[in-house]
Amino acid sequence: MESSYVVFILLSLILLPNHSLWLASANLEGDALHTLRVTLVDPNNVLQSWDPTLVNPCTWFHVTCNNENSVIRVDLGNAELSGHLVPELGVLKNLQYLELYSNNITGPIPSNLGNLTNLVSLDLYLNSFSGPIPESLGKLSKLRFLRLNNNSLTGSIPMSLTNITTLQVLDLSNNRLSGSVPDNGSFSLFTPISFANNLDLCGPVTSHPCPGSPPFSPPPPFIQPPPVSTPSGYGITGAIAGGVAAGAALLFAAPAIAFAWWRRRKPLDIFFDVPAEEDPEVHLGQLKRFSLRELQVASDGFSNKNILGRGGFGKVYKGRLADGTLVAVKRLKEERTPGGELQFQTEVEMISMAVHRNLLRLRGFCMTPTERLLVYPYMANGSVASCLRERPPSQPPLDWPTRKRIALGSARGLSYLHDHCDPKIIHRDVKAANILLDEEFEAVVGDFGLAKLMDYKDTHVTTAVRGTIGHIAPEYLSTGKSSEKTDVFGYGIMLLELITGQRAFDLARLANDDDVMLLDWVKGLLKEKKLEMLVDPDLQTNYEERELEQVIQVALLCTQGSPMERPKMSEVVRMLEGDGLAEKWDEWQKVEILREEIDLSPNPNSDWILDSTYNLHAVELSGPR
């Protein structure tokens, strides 16, 4: 007995300092965030849960922590906040994502943000920040995304930023910056888009020479090469020998110079690039233009063994570039039309400007007279659909925390497409197969922007319905009219895929006299109060029933028959974060009860899809607790 007591005392002495350290860390981070809350004006009570009496800020909405209860993410984008930032944010040593975009925050950017050495993404765009960009931000050695555009920042661009070798995306446009734009280090990768609309910036990338520097020489005019015959497998039906010879003569000097330069860089490769047709007036952002030959080699001649998937837009191939980087090459199938090259370049530019951690980032493109290809990073963990239904026995199933993270991440990506792209982008084919998973199983929305881009109108009528059966919103299928709410419907079905593990449309369910449409099948089980039967068997009982019910509630709100009644994706994000779901669900229940009482007839245009859009009794699920 005495020895047991001694062991207990020793363990207490060992563990108590660690516990004290954790409390101290949590208190510091909580105090810093509460200080931020005090200085911000919050008209929508977004920060209501930031209670200083709670030691651990990990319980607060819009705050994410790691397993050690350290804050790693603060998400307060598009929250209508005003006020200013506080230097105390510098104590969040493990913070990776600071998202404060699209608010009305004023004042300077605190130099203490340079202490956040684990920061990966700093998004302060679309605010009213003033003053200089802190030199201390150059210490953020892990930073990949730095977006300070659309503020009122002044002064010069700190040279220290060029030392951030990990920097992939930089946007300083639409400010009041002045002086020379650095062109060394990581800044050598960036194009005029990163610095646009800063009238007092100068340097080669801005096309405004700095005082005392020689004027820029305009580039020589580009001579369009004639079509060159290629192997018949790529659809060229012939070429005129004289034209080829003339084209070769005209372009002799350019390929020779390119070849000599290329040989100095890559002496072991056996192919070289020739100039491709390109409109010099179209800027393509921070994109690499690949040659067709380069992508042919990377994919082993677009071999069938390298096919990752097939879809309505074409096939996707796995490829390995000359430097060893794995990529996914999407080979688009489309009819060639007059002016199609310019349209393709314009759409590629729009896609490239949609940069968010939950969106699949376009790495480059290839355009020839016969081919259109897009190059993306390779996602080793595949898609949500493959992880749910096609995983090998050696791969563990997606657990419930991962599924929740996928739901929230994909919602954030779609919200960015709808609310922060100009023009906004409507996906039109949201489904589990188009939600990819990176190395950390973070959701990455793919295949966006491949349908026609939205203009500034609220809706767009297309000549062909894009999408997958089971995911298509009823109004889109019947009228061809799409909007953001079309994506919301598809997202709701994707949530049901996450919960059930099943396909959105599956004829195999007929064997059990079940509905082939996943939405109808789920509603049928809910009417029979068989919640446990719709849960993916791979989850077993390893999930929180309350959280499961809340995700189902969000899915049902997203799949309402009327697009006007569906929430926006930004509202979906807030509901998944725990903000506003109870009110939305209660409001929806009242509407459903009213429909039953007055026997409200459904829209006659939607009679055929009645089971998928109406008549779910309001008592199927308990409200949020």
UniProtKB/Swiss-Prot annotation:
**Gene deletion effect:** No visible phenotype. Serk1 and serk2 double mutants are completely male sterile due to a failure in tapetum specification. Delayed floral abscission.
- Binding of brassinolide occurs at 61-62
Q: How is the activity of this protein regulated?
A: Inhibited by manganese.
Glycosylation, residue list: 104, 115, 150, 163, 184
Q: Name the top EC class.
A: transferase
- LRR repeat boundaries? 92-116, 118-140, 141-164, 165-189
Transmembrane ranges, per UniProt, are 239-259
Gene3D superfamilies assigned: Phosphorylase Kinase, domain 1, Ribonuclease Inhibitor, Transferase(Phosphotransferase) domain 1
Q: What does the PTM comment of the record read?
A: Glycosylated. Important for targeting to the plasma membrane.
Per UniProt, ATP binds at: 308-316, 330
Q: Where is the signal peptide?
A: 1-26
Q: Which cofactor does it need?
A: Mg(2+)
Side Cytoplasmic, residues: 260-625
Substituting residue 570 to A results in: No effect. Reduction of autophosphorylation
Q: EC number(s) on record?
A: 2.7.10.1, 2.7.11.1
Q: Consequence of mutating residue 562 to A?
A: Loss of autophosphorylation
Q: What is this protein called?
A: Somatic embryogenesis receptor kinase 1
Q: Which organism is it from?
A: Arabidopsis thaliana
Q: Which gene encodes it?
A: SERK1
